[in-house]
């Protein structure tokens, strides 16, 4: 029979009506002669009741045979439920079955299909099709759909055109590792899967499309963590003739619509703006979590006046004050914080407790004569804990920024119901790479540098003290609760400036033409001023759903080894396939 309703949508308005529902058995109970079946579909659960003494024989037999995860078709009359369940939408009714057909049977599942069950991550991924039956996972995936629907509605209404860009691209440097695809036709040559549609969307601007968007898969071969996957989805935008501020305003309106549509939350516009240097100096991060204070304080001038060699020889001395928490941190717990600081590059972690008007523990003996100065500078009150890092500016910021997040969680300083958006602006154009021993582009090499700092592009990029560090970019990141939600910039639209930028990054003209010749040539044909942004869809939905791993909002993700336990991808392929591609494998143990 044709399904008349989703099981989870049947309420009191259907009383005394005959309905047909189809779904999975979530639970079956035989109580005092009555058989109760909780039937589940994507919308929720409805209770089916069968009285074997009054029901038709085939109905009673099917109800008796049904087990968890059997697929059933049930027809029956909607009646008022004697014992109501206010926790579910259908809790006021049940269906008296007049017909039951078993559409499919099921083996015993490797884990219970319910939310409050502990299952190993790889087991969940191996049986992802079962994991997705759980109500929480269904909710996450439908929330993702609601998010993309809201995004499309806004962008379509704002005059954006959805354009697909190619997946088989040219491999270019200045990014993460590419996923390479060998060409059978052009032997010995490779395509690269796109890390983003960056260059293609810029070319669409010179093609005259003016406003482009795409919700698109991207690929990066990088080490994985909770908010990264080898394949991910981004909301990709590009516009012509808009200023940096206009692009930000447009993005804010888009996000405000999503927040209202998906979460029912009205967000305040415009979002706060924070300069990159302020984010690093006060939060120790270029993606600051502004839901709580615990700011970094630069104590360099004061700290270098005391007789403590570690402070005197450091480039900077910075600190955070954990208010009214000295008694909550034992030496053992401070040692754990010290290890975390070291993992973030610090040589160590100095500390003191302020108790009864004086410093105690840690480096207190070095601060004793300057107690009043430190108390005034840090605005200390009784039972405060002070943590210091003495190092280079970058290390001090990074180490204390990481500790700030850890302590914020430990001390319950974070309101997890909040959604704090902000823009991080005024970025440096380049960042130093110790591994490469040169400056690299902080975003990408197509970002427009500010007019005031373009003259520094001619500086040598192989010295950390180079004037390249003075170049600023028309770049902007949007941050939500300590996560980079997306990033964008105005782009270079003249060939001369683009060649200067590539030269600053160490490209010889010949190499620049080899890698980016198609873009450089396009810049000779009337390229409009343009800019854009990309939002991480997986990360956005993860935060909307209150999760801490994007796997929870992706239907079929990879594990931390970039593998799929369900399909066993990646896998060995047949020798014949490799021969067709002219590929010979080296010893994988080498």
UniProtKB/Swiss-Prot annotation:
It is found in: Cytoplasm. Transmembrane segments: none annotated. One of its GO terms (biological process) is aspartyl-tRNA aminoacylation. Its EC number is 6.1.1.12. The keyword Iron-sulfur does not apply. Residues 198-201 are annotated as: Aspartate. It comes from the Bacteria. GO terms for molecular function: aspartate-tRNA ligase activity; ATP binding; catalytic activity, acting on a protein; nucleic acid binding; transferase activity. It is an enzyme of class 6 (ligase). This is Aspartate--tRNA ligase.
């Amino acid at each position: 029979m044709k399904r008349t309703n989703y099981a989870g949508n049947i309420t009191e308005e259907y009383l005394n009506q005959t309905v047909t529902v189809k779904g999975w058995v979530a639970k079956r109970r035989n109580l005092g002669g009555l058989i109760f079946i909780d039937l589940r579909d994507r919308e929720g659960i409805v209770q089916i009741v069968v009285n074997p003494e009054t029901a038709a024989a085939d109905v009673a037999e099917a109800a008796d045979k049904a087990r968890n995860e059997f697929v059933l078709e049930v027809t029956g009359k909607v009646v008022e439920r004697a014992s109501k369940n206010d926790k579910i939408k259908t809790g006021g009714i049940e269906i008296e079955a007049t017909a039951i057909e078993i559409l499919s049977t099921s083996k015993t599942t490797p884990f219970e299909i319910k939310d409050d069950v502990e299952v190993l991550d790889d087991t969940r991924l191996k049986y992802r099709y079962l994991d997705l039956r759980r109500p929480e996972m269904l909710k996450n995936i439908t929330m993702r759909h609601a998010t993309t629907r809201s995004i499309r509605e806004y962008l379509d209404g704002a005059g954006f055109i959805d354009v697909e860009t190619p997946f088989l691209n040219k491999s270019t440097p200045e990014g993460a590792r590419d996923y390479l695809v060998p060409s059978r036709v052009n032997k010995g040559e490779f395509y690269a899967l796109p890390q983003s549609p960056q260059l293609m969307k810029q070319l669409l601007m010179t093609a005259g499309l003016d406003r482009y968007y795409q919700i698109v898969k991207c690929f990066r071969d990088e080490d994985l963590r909770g908010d990264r996957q080898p394949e991910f989805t981004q909301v990709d935008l590009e516009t012509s003739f808009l200023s940096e501020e206009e692009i930000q305003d447009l993005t804010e309106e888009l996000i405000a619509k999503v927040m209202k549509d998906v979460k029912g939350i009205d967000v305040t516009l415009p979002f706060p703006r924070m300069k990159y240097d302020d984010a690093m100096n006060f939060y120790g991060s270029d993606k600051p979590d502004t839901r709580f204070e615990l700011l970094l304080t630069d104590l360099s001038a004061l700290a270098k006046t005391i007789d403590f060699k570690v402070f005197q020889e450091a480039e900077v001395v910075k600190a955070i004050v954990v208010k009214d928490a000295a008694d909550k941190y034992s030496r053992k717990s401070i040692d754990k914080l010290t290890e975390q600081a070291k993992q973030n590059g610090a040589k160590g972690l100095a500390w003191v407790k302020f108790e009864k008007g004086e410093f105690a523990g840690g480096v207190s003996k070095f601060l004793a004569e300057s107690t009043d100065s430190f108390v005034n500078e840090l605005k200390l009150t009784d039972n405060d804990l002070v943590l210091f890092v003495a190092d280079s500016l970058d290390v001090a910021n990074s180490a204390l920024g990481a500790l700030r997040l850890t302590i914020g969680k430990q001390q319950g300083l974070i309101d997890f119901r909040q959604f704090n958006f902000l823009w991080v602006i005024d970025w440096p154009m380049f960042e130093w790479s110790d591994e490469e021993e040169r400056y690299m582009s902080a975003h990408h090499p197509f970002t427009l540098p500010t007019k005031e700092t373009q003259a520094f592009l001619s500086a040598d990029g192989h010295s950390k003290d180079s004037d390249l560090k003075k170049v600023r970019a028309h770049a902007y990141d949007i941050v939500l609760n300590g996560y980079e939600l997306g990033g964008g910039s105005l782009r270079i639209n003249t060939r001369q400036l683009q060649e200067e930028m590539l030269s600053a990054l160490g490209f010889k003209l010949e190499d620049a033409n080899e890698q980016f010749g198609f873009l450089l040539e396009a810049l000779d044909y009337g390229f409009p001023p343009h800019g854009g942004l990309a939002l991480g869809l997986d990360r956005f939905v993860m935060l909307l759903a209150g999760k801490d791993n994007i796997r929870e909002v992706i239907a079929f993700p990879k594990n931390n080894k970039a593998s799929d336990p369900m399909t066993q991808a990646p896998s060995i392929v047949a020798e014949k396939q490799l021969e067709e591609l002219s590929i010979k494998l080296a010893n994988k143990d080498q």
